[in-house]
Curated annotation (Swiss-Prot):
Reactions it catalyzes: an N-(acyl)-sphingosylphosphocholine = an N-(acyl)-sphingosyl-1,3-cyclic phosphate + choline; an N-(acyl)-sphingosylphosphoethanolamine = an N-(acyl)-sphingosyl-1,3-cyclic phosphate + ethanolamine; a 1-acyl-sn-glycero-3-phosphocholine = a 1-acyl-sn-glycero-2,3-cyclic phosphate + choline; a 1-acyl-sn-glycero-3-phosphoethanolamine = a 1-acyl-sn-glycero-2,3-cyclic phosphate + ethanolamine
Lineage, uppermost ranks: Eukaryota, Metazoa, Ecdysozoa, Arthropoda, Chelicerata
Keyword Secreted among record annotations: yes
UniProt GO cellular component terms: extracellular region
Protein keywords: Cytolysis, Dermonecrotic toxin, Disulfide bond, Hemolysis, Lipid degradation, Lipid metabolism, Lyase, Magnesium, Metal-binding, Secreted, Toxin
Cell compartments where the protein resides: Secreted
Name of this chain's protein: Dermonecrotic toxin SpeSicTox-betaIIA3i
Major enzyme class: lyase
Gene3D superfamilies registered for this protein in UniProt: Phosphatidylinositol (PI) phosphodiesterase
Family, similarity comment: Belongs to the arthropod phospholipase D family. Class II subfamily.
Record bears the keyword Lyase: yes
């Protein structure tokens, strides 16, 4: 999975897909009551990027629905995963539940269309800190109350704050979640980051019987040397400001027979087992 990073304006969606991304990450900004208003990162953000691009959240969902709906004139078959970077750290953790209700409702109304020809992409809920776990409970509660639990099959969870992996597992256990989990490891592209925690996450992923990390990705990679380092370790995904650079690295002899781009036929919740 090549995740285009910080794809917050509607016109950027096709731009990043044209560069080779098959997944996009966008920032969801909330008001003080936990209502998702905009896809917007704000200042500061990654080096070399414009931090202020944005769209109205519901309009953005309407657009990516078209891009991920077969038969729609805007359909792009390569876009298979949407990662919502939920900016919950900007609001009180008491509002995390309200935020979960709001995001689930907006996805039902604007993306899934409550079963009426909605978008098909998988959804990854990127939650900054384990203290905001009530968001997940609220999201699942809302799908159940609205009679649309079938969409749970399309939704995954990812804690992105580089917290202790065992603490994350404990929170997932508390929530009763042991499926559809990704684990991110990384830092803004402005700073270097070692591989200690990334290696630990990959080790857990590869431990037989360990359910809490089937997929691991590294972010935000801009240098080809760091992309190669992550691929050598065996990550499932790379988030980058430059998807075309990732595509180039994947074509190199060292990687071309080990990796391929994920398609809609690949289940993002299953641990990859080499043949």
């Amino acid at each position: 999975w090549i995740m285009g990073h910080m794809v917050n304006a509607i016109e950027q969606v096709d731009e990043f897909l044209d560069l080779g991304a098959n997944a996009i990450e966008f920032d969801v900004d909330f008001d003080d009551d936990g209502v998702a208003k905009y896809t917007h990162h704000g200042i500061p953000c990654d080096c070399g990027r414009l931090c202020t691009k944005y769209a109205v959240f519901t309009e953005y969902l309407d657009y990516v629905r078209q891009v991920t709906t077969p038969g729609d004139p805007k359909f792009r078959k390569e876009l298979v995963l949407l990662a919502l970077d939920l900016k919950l750290q900007r609001i009180s953790s008491e509002k995390a539940y309200a935020a979960g209700v709001d995001v689930a409702t907006k996805l039902l109304d604007h993306y899934w269309m409550r079963g009426w020809n909605g978008g098909r992409a998988y959804i990854l809920l990127n939650i900054p800190l384990v203290e905001d776990y009530e968001f997940i409970r609220a999201f699942k509660d809302t799908l159940r109350k609205e009679g649309h639990e079938q969409y749970n099959a399309k939704v995954g969870i990812n804690f992105t704050g580089n917290e202790d992996l065992d603490e994350i597992r404990e929170v997932l256990e508390k929530l009763g979640e042991d499926e559809h989990i990704w684990q991110a490891d990384g830092i803004t592209s402005c700073f270097p980051r070692g591989t200690e925690r990334l290696k630990k996450a990959l080790e857990k992923r590869d431990t037989p019987g360990y359910k809490y990390i089937p997929k691991v990705y590294a972010w935000t990679l801009v240098r080809s040397s760091i992309m190669r380092r992550s691929l050598r370790l065996g990550v499932d995904g790379v988030m980058s400001n430059y998807p075309d650079s990732v595509v180039k690295v994947l074509k190199e002899k060292e990687f071309s027979d080990k990796f391929r781009l994920a398609t809609y036929a690949d289940n993002p919740w299953e641990k990859f087992t080499p043949i």
